UniProtKB/Swiss-Prot annotation:
<keyword id="KW-0479">Metal-binding</keyword>
<comment type="function">
    <text>DNA-dependent RNA polymerase catalyzes the transcription of DNA into RNA using the four ribonucleoside triphosphates as substrates.</text>
</comment>
<dbReference type="InterPro" id="IPR038120">
    <property type="entry name" value="Rpb1_funnel_sf"/>
</dbReference>
<feature type="binding site">
    <location>
        <position position="466"/>
    </location>
    <ligand>
        <name>Mg(2+)</name>
    </ligand>
</feature>
<dbReference type="InterPro" id="IPR042102">
    <property type="entry name" value="RNA_pol_Rpb1_3_sf"/>
</dbReference>
<dbReference type="Pfam" id="PF04983">
    <property type="entry name" value="RNA_pol_Rpb1_3"/>
</dbReference>
<feature type="binding site">
    <location>
        <position position="811"/>
    </location>
    <ligand>
        <name>Zn(2+) 2</name>
    </ligand>
</feature>
<keyword id="KW-0460">Magnesium</keyword>
<dbReference type="InterPro" id="IPR045867">
    <property type="entry name" value="DNA-dir_RpoC_beta_prime"/>
</dbReference>
<dbReference type="InterPro" id="IPR007081">
    <property type="entry name" value="RNA_pol_Rpb1_5"/>
</dbReference>
<dbReference type="Pfam" id="PF05000">
    <property type="entry name" value="RNA_pol_Rpb1_4"/>
</dbReference>
<dbReference type="InterPro" id="IPR000722">
    <property type="entry name" value="RNA_pol_asu"/>
</dbReference>
<keyword id="KW-0240">DNA-directed RNA polymerase</keyword>
<feature type="binding site">
    <location>
        <position position="895"/>
    </location>
    <ligand>
        <name>Zn(2+) 2</name>
    </ligand>
</feature>
<dbReference type="InterPro" id="IPR007066">
    <property type="entry name" value="RNA_pol_Rpb1_3"/>
</dbReference>
<dbReference type="GO" id="GO:0000428">
    <property type="term" value="C:DNA-directed RNA polymerase complex"/>
</dbReference>
<protein>
    <recommendedName>
        <fullName>DNA-directed RNA polymerase subunit beta'</fullName>
        <ecNumber>2.7.7.6</ecNumber>
    </recommendedName>
</protein>
């Protein structure tokens, strides 16, 4: 029997094994070698017989038989004629499957250009020929001739000639004196005659000579393509095709529908057009038709081939019968519906089902309820096998009948089959890895899947009609992985932040909170209980309540495992919770002897997990859930309208604020403040009022009241219980119900000045209702838009990080990042402990006073160490980071630190990149889906003061302080910092003070925690004088540079600087305020410059000419923008902007060196700012700043490297160039974290660091050394290291480069793997580039392996790959030894050697 047939029944035949995939341009010979025959006719199938036409697009002679082992005319049927070619119809007798793999070809009568190389920008053909794309197209589409060989004529090579010019030239020089051609033949000749080596040499020489940047870029582009061709072995003329391949017919099917019509793939239409035009052209050439007709036909052939390869790339889109554009070969690959994303990366699988989910509170954590009907269908093959094994059926048919009849024995067998066979549950959208978990199925009646309540958080599921899908892992390995890695009991911690995710929520929290409440004066107060039995008895007989204050004995074990018992002041309810705690010395009763809010419950579960291990935690979680549900039910907590308390003080607060607002209106009418300032103040006043009302309301709701008759404490307010416990609702929602609704935002994000004074209990007026709908509607619209954006962000993140895998244990690097606590507005938002937990220490950490060792270098910082470090008051710690890891591919385990989802050091082969991407992307969607919960209620708090966050002594760095005429201390320095030192002189905090701030402390003062250090006006920025004297104006011309606005209602004027460059007359002005001394001369500043203060647009003057001013007085104020509400809507685009490394619109200008400011000569409408360097041997740096921009520095100010010359958001590229990688990392991490923090989402820094690492993979060459690189090349970091190693070995000069920051999209498209890049975006461009360079994909990342259908090189797949690699090299060595004839004896010790060296063995 034939081998192929044997293989059918023996699937264990290994697939072809390959290590890499190469892509290159196909030469005409190559295309012919693939082909099984030429297609000569455009016919497809015969419409009567449905048989394919001979030599047509479906020809059976070329592509193979339609039915297995049967030729077309029916002469040979059956297996026995296999391989025979029928002499009548010419069809080979074989499997019809070959119609999916055999290709054909079309011989073109005239060459045509491949549209990818022509039109995919930058055009490869035109770059190579050094012509413009327009010119190349003119030649290709038969508009102009091109001179290929000028001979001795006056014509130039590559000169374009129109028809008339060509005729004139022929008349003038004669036809044989020069060669001019037209069409693809011309381009073919030019490409074929190129001497690539010579061109490359010329280009390099020219590059060395040229100085212009633009020219350099152009030459480099061309040189790159020339070198690509030389290295890959492709020939340039292959970009012009003489033969077109035809893909196998079963990949472009033609299916007869009923009613005599056909459904066909668009490709058949496109191929038909090509064949028709090609045949017509052949006929015209044979007939010797006039040149113009032939030329037209050639142009049409070129267009039809273009449409076949990439429809719509050039000219009109070719449409089918129904005006729909035809799908070309490129469209088959591109986009979400293309081959890559639809069929290779995402496949539909069998053995799956989906149904609605309902809650299953009586399940264990590792179980799910599976409907019987569903299980019967999903496990059918297993049931058939078991029925056969037990002798109930002898054939599959019989088994099928038994199952269909649902005989009782079938149900018994189903029970056996399902036992301990895990199934996977998945809820779409799967935003992180916890969206798919494994459970053991329990058969249930009905048609709904039952889900354990505790895993709802991970799936983000609720029971309002959500559906979930079930998948059955079939092979033993798959079942093993499902059980060991994916079981819900193995996913207790959240991979994003390491906190427990199996945490009770809603009812369970409420029940536990109710249990743990302690009330005064309850019956039985002060009783003592010796054990839990007595307690239960007392509760049953109602001698005590759950909330009575009692003394109870709690029994547990100490740290050595010895049992002990201790008496606590507690309540019966808390003892009931304590009863469930696992017995462990590290888990004391104190963790549940408190009010059990959601936070405390989470901490409790975390403690249990860290000290008692997984099994105990799972059992504990299940019990605590049962307890919570039971008591939530028994407590019977509900709420009515009277639970929403409206505070009595509300009316007074509102009245006071209304008076205040009236006062502001009056001030505005009197011209004391501007419209913008009034707006800010009013918004601020209402914001404060809302807060006050909320505080009053909370105080009322929280208040403990006692019953006069019984003296017992009244039950707590239900709404307060729900909110405070964390079960449902937030103080914000309570405020809207019982306080006042507050300020609302317009859809544009601005805040409406009039707030909503009513709350929902009182009801809104029509006006208020209308205003509130604004915000609510914006919320809903945002939600819809943001979900898509967030999904796209996640996709880009996954794509950039997918090949970041833990590949080694330790890279041994000496570099890392410095971690400090993050302080925002005087509040510590992220403590140093939280940031370093689970990271590896880079240096030894010693106690600053006693000097004793806390953590050794290279060891992980664990929970006890964090406590020690925070006690010791250490401010900054150097840690290892994935960002500075020196492993070439992937990262090492030590740099990454703790695997957050397991709480142990990260395992080899963990796909940390994907986990990072999911951790950052998942909350993006969560948040955006939740925007409307705030109903657009505005929250404006502009910080306007500094508070001491520690106790200690003040020290002021770069001190520059004056006392103004009011006797206040004023900060005059641009980069002053107030530091607080503790009694040991260790710096505890350091905060920048804004210019113009009023200081409450000075050097050497002692401060208490929470004391005000400084304050400033958050709405304007002052300009102050540091010398006393008389004011004089310069260039402040009415109507040109300053506008005197008289307020009509008040008649008071104020002066505001306007944009003076808008008129030609004003273009030379430099508006300024000058201070003159007593003798009438311009006063001198302490630094030696003149006291001349330049003004920016929109500045409001605070002085008149002739005003006497003293030091520290304000001359003018620049208003800052009005406050906008913060909402993740601003957040998500912000995160995307940071990851894409886009330059912000008005980005800050950052000083590159330390030095003093000097103002140079202005340039057009820009101001020239020069920094004179502080140290010698450094060139001064100059910046041009648009004149209207608020520029706050004065001549002579000292500025440090990294300070802002012009305010704004800094461009990440500048931070990288000026301050280096570490500063960039901390900037990106902090900015991204800020967005998430605002929404209360905790993400560990290391995830963001992993992504930033992927963005810093490229290096720009600054010095090429002896390498083949050119200065300005963007090279892979790893590649550069390899090249340099080789250069140094040969004693040559290595190349140097600076790190380049790429946005995530760019970084994804520039991965070494072209398969991964092509499946991401811009498929045609990526494949074109890869083909020209003849790229090889080494299948390193996850995506490319999924696409070619192998196990991913991470996790269990990675281990298999390692083992396979060792085995292969071992076999090679043994064969090598055999060849040498020394036998295999020597190979064994070498083998052990290799196994030790292999990374897997680590």
């Amino acid at each position: 029997m034939n081998q192929e047939v044997m293989n059918l029944f023996n699937p264990q035949v290994p697939a072809q094994n390959f290590d890499s995939i190469r892509i290159s341009i196909a030469s005409p010979e190559k295309i012919l070698s693939w082909s099984y025959g030429e297609i000569k006719k455009p016919e497809t199938i015969n419409y009567r017989t449905f048989k394919p036409e001979r030599d047509g697009l479906f020809c059976a002679r070329i592509f193979g038989p339609i039915k297995d082992y049967e030729c077309l005319c029916g002469k040979y049927k059956r297996m026995k004629y296999k391989g025979i070619i029928c002499e009548k119809c010419g069809v080979e007798v074989t499997l019809s499957r070959v119609r999916r793999e055999r290709m054909g070809h079309i011989e073109l009568a005239a060459p045509v250009a491949h549209i990818w190389f022509l039109k995919s920008l930058p055009s490869r053909i035109s770059t190579l020929l050094d012509m413009t794309l327009k010119d190349v197209e003119r030649v290709l589409y038969f508009e102009n001739y091109i001179v290929t060989e000028p001979g001795l004529t006056a014509l130039k090579e590559h000169q374009l000639l129109s028809e008339e010019e060509y005729m004139l030239a022929v008349d003038e020089y004669g036809e044989d004196q020069f060669t001019a051609m037209i069409g693809a033949e011309a381009i073919y000749e030019m490409l074929a005659s190129m001497n690539l080596e010579k061109i490359a040499g010329d280009l390099r020489a020219e590059l060395a000579d040229t100085t212009s940047d633009l020219k350099q870029k152009k030459l480099m582009k061309r040189l790159k393509i020339v070198e690509n061709f030389m290295e890959s072995g492709n020939r340039p003329e292959w970009m012009i095709m003489k033969v077109v391949p035809v893909i196998p017919p079963d990949l472009r099917p033609l299916v007869p529908l009923d009613g005599g019509r056909f459904a066909t793939s668009d490709l058949n239409d496109l191929y038909r057009r090509v064949i028709n035009r090609n045949n017509r052209l052949k006929r015209l050439i044979e007939l010797r038709a006039p040149g113009i007709i032939i030329r037209n036909e050639k142009r049409m052939l070129q267009e039809s081939v273009d449409a076949l390869f990439d429809n719509g790339r050039r000219g009109r889109v070719i449409t089918g019968a129904n005006k729909r554009p035809l799908k070309s070969l490129s469209d088959m690959l591109k986009g979400k519906q293309g081959r890559f994303r639809q069929n290779l990366l995402g496949k539909r699988v069998d053995y799956s089902g989906r149904s609605v989910i309902v809650t299953g509170p009586e399940l264990k954590l590792h179980q799910c309820g599976l409907p019987k009907k569903m299980a019967l269908e999903l496990f059918k093959p297993f049931i058939y096998a078991r029925l056969d094994a037990k002798g109930y059926s002898s054939t599959v048919k019989q088994a099928k009948k038994l199952v269909e009849k649902e005989k009782p024995e079938v149900w018994d067998i189903l029970d056996e089959v399902i036992r301990e066979h895990p199934v996977l549950l998945n809820r779409a959208p799967t935003l992180h890895r916890l969206g798919i978990q494994a459970f053991e199925p329990i058969l249930v009646e009905g048609k709904a899947i039952q889900l354990h309540p505790l895993v709802c958080t991970a799936f983000n599921a609720d029971f309002d009609g959500d559906q979930m899908a079930v998948h059955v892992p079939l092979s033993l390995e798959a079942q093993l992985e499902a059980r060991v890695l994916m079981m819900s009991t193995n996913n207790i911690l959240h991979p994003a932040n390491g906190a427990p995710i199996i945490v009770p929520s809603q009812d369970m929290v409420l029940g536990l909170y109710y249990l743990s409440i302690l009330n005064q004066n309850e019956p039985g107060e002060g009783m003592a209980f010796s054990d839990l039995g007595e307690l239960h008895h007392a509760l049953e007989s109602k001698v005590v309540t759950l909330h009575t204050k009692i003394r109870g004995r709690f029994k547990s074990v100490d740290e050595d495992g010895k049992p002990y018992s201790k008496i606590y002041e507690t309540t019966p309810g808390r003892l009931l919770i304590g009863e469930l705690l696992p017995k462990n010395g590290k888990v004391p009763f104190d963790i549940c002897n408190q009010e059990m809010t959601k936070k405390n419950i989470s901490k409790m579960i975390d403690t249990v997990y860290r000290h008692c291990g997984q099994k105990d935690t799972v059992i504990f979680c299940d019990r605590i859930m049962q307890l919570g549900f039971a008591h939530a039910c028994r407590a019977g907590i509900s709420f009515g309208k009277d639970d929403m308390v409206i505070p009595d003080a509300k009316a007074k607060i509102v009245a006071d604020t209304e008076n205040l607002v009236k006062e502001y209106e009056q001030q505005y009418n009197d011209g004391l403040i501007t419209q913008g300032e009034k707006y800010n103040k009013v918004v601020d006043a209402w914001g404060k009022a809302t807060e006050k009302v909320a505080e009053e309301m909370m105080a009322r709701i929280k208040a403990v009241e006692f019953d006069e008759k019984t003296g017992r404490q009244k039950p707590m307010n239900s709404i307060y219980m729900m909110s405070h416990s964390g079960a449902r609702g937030s103080p914000n929602q309570m405020r809207q119900l019982g306080g006042m609704r507050g300020l609302m935002a317009k859809p544009s994000g601005e805040i409406i000045e009039t707030p909503i004074i009513s709350n929902f209990k009182e009801g809104l007026t029509v006006n208020e209702y209308f205003n509130s709908t604004h915000g609510a509607r914006k919320g809903l619209a945002d939600t819809a838009l943001k979900t898509a954006n967030s999904g796209y962000l996640t996709r880009r993140l996954v794509d950039v990080a997918q090949d970041c895998i833990v590949t080694h244990v330790d890279c041994g690097t000496q570099t890392g990042l410095t971690m400090t606590a993050i302080v925002d507005a005087g509040q510590v938002v992220a403590s140093i402990g939280a940031r370093i937990l689970g990271r590896t220490a880079l240096d030894d950490i010693d106690h600053p006073v006693t000097g004793e060792r806390i953590v050794d270098a290279g060891k992980m910082i664990l929970e006890p160490d964090v406590v020690e470090i925070e006690k010791a008051g250490i401010q900054s710690i150097r840690i290892r980071s994935a960002l500075t890891c020196e492993i070439q591919t992937g990262v090492c385990s030590v740099c990454y630190g703790r695997d957050l989802a397991r709480g142990t050091p990260v395992n080899m082969g963990e796909a940390v990149g994907v986990i990072a991407a999911q951790s950052i992307g998942e909350p993006g969607t969560q948040l955006t889906m939740r925007t409307f919960h705030l109903g657009g209620t505005a929250t404006v708090v502009d910080q306007s003061f500094l508070e001491a966050s520690y106790e200690g002594t003040v020290q002021i760095k770069n001190r520059n302080i004056l006392r103004n005429s009011d006797g206040n201390l004023v900060a005059m320095g641009r980069n002053m910092t107030v530091q607080i030192l503790d009694e040991r002189g260790v710096e505890r905090s350091s905060q920048r003070v804004a210019y113009g701030s009023k200081l409450h402390v000075d050097e050497g003062d002692k401060v208490k925690r929470g004391q005000r250090l400084a304050e400033w006006d958050p709405y304007t920025r002052p300009m102050m004088t540091e010398v006393a004297g008389t004011v004089q104006f310069e260039d402040l011309v009415d109507g040109l540079s300053v506008l005197e606005a008289t307020d009509e209602s008040t008649g008071i004027t104020k002066r505001q600087v306007i944009d003076w460059r808008s008129t030609p007359r004003g273009s030379d002005l430099k508006p300024a305020i000058v201070i003159k001394d007593a003798s009438g001369n311009i006063a001198k500043l302490s630094r030696g410059g003149d006291a001349r203060f330049f003004l920016s647009v929109d500045a409001i003057l605070s002085v008149e000419p002739g005003t006497k001013v003293s030091q520290g007085d304000v001359l003018a104020r620049s208003p800052l923008e009005s406050a906008k509400t913060k909402d993740i809507t601003g957040g998500l685009p912000r995160v995307a902007e940071l990851f894409e490394a886009r330059r912000p619109k008005d980005h800050a200008i950052i000083a590159e060196i330390d030095g003093t400011i000097r103002l140079g000569r202005d340039y057009k409408n820009k101001r020239r700012v020069i920094i004179e360097p502080a140290e010698d041997g450094v060139e001064p740096v100059e910046y041009l700043i648009p004149k209207g921009k608020p520029f706050h520095l004065q001549e002579g100010d000292y500025i440090e490297k990294g300070d802002y010359i012009l305010d704004g958001n800094p461009a990440p590229h500048d931070i990288l160039a000026i301050k280096g990688v570490e500063a960039l990392a901390s900037y990106l991490v902090n900015e991204i974290q800020e967005v998430y923090r605002l929404q209360g989402v905790v993400i560990n820094d290391k995830h963001i660091e992993v992504i930033v690492r992927q963005m810093l993979q490229k290096v720009e060459i600054t010095d090429a050394g002896d390498s083949t690189y050119i200065v300005g090349d963007n090279v892979d970091r790893i590649e550069l290291e390899d090249v340099n190693d080789h250069l140094i070995e040969q004693g040559k000069k290595p190349a140097y480069g600076d790190p380049v920051l790429l946005g995530i999209t760019k970084a994804s498209l520039q991965t070494p793997s072209f398969i991964s890049a092509a499946s991401f975006q811009e498929t045609t461009k990526v494949l074109t580039e890869a083909a020209i360079a003849g790229k090889t994909d080494g299948l390193q990342g996850l995506k490319e392996n999924v696409i070619v259908g192998r196990l991913i090189p991470a996790g269990t797949g990675g281990t298999m790959t390692q083992i396979r690699r060792i085995a292969t090299s071992r076999d090679e060595m043994i064969l090598e030894e055999r060849r040498k004839g020394t036998g295999a004896a020597v190979a064994t010790p070498m083998l052990q050697d290799m196994a030790e060296k292999a990374p897997a063995a680590e």
